[in-house]
């Protein structure tokens, strides 16, 4: 089972104590800029799981997401 872990400027996807993906972001004013999305195993939905976590975190903390990386852009276009 994949666990989401929030750290400063990073959201990690962990499985069996191993990082299987991460999002790197920056915060400024009311904006959360998604800089990079990494999923170390493709086809498992890890990137989407991370983006879902980022969207939820941004909403809870009243940030607007600015998708810098192409994965974040494509994910948000679908929503």
Residue ranges of model-derived segments:
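Active-site rim helix/loop that mediates acceptor-substrate recognition in acyltransferases
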Residues: 1-10
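Conserved beta-hairpin
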Residues: 9-20
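Conserved beta-strand in the GNAT
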Residues: 18-26, 33
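Mid-chain, well-packed structural core segment of small domains
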Residues: 33-34, 73
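A short, internal acetyl-CoA/4′-phosphopantetheine-binding micro-motif in the GNAT/acyltransferase core
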Residues: 36-43
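Conserved GNAT acetyl-CoA-binding A-motif
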Residues: 57-71
């Amino acid at each position: 089972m994949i666990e989401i872990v929030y750290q400063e400027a990073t959201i990690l996807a962990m499985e069996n104590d191993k990082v299987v993906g991460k999002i790197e972001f920056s915060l400024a004013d009311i904006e959360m800029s998604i800089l990079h999305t990494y999923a170390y195993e493709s086809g498992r939905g890890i990137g989407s799981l991370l983006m879902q976590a980022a969207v939820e975190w941004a909403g809870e903390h009243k940030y607007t997401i600015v998708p810098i990386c192409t994965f974040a852009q494509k994910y948000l276009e679908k929503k």
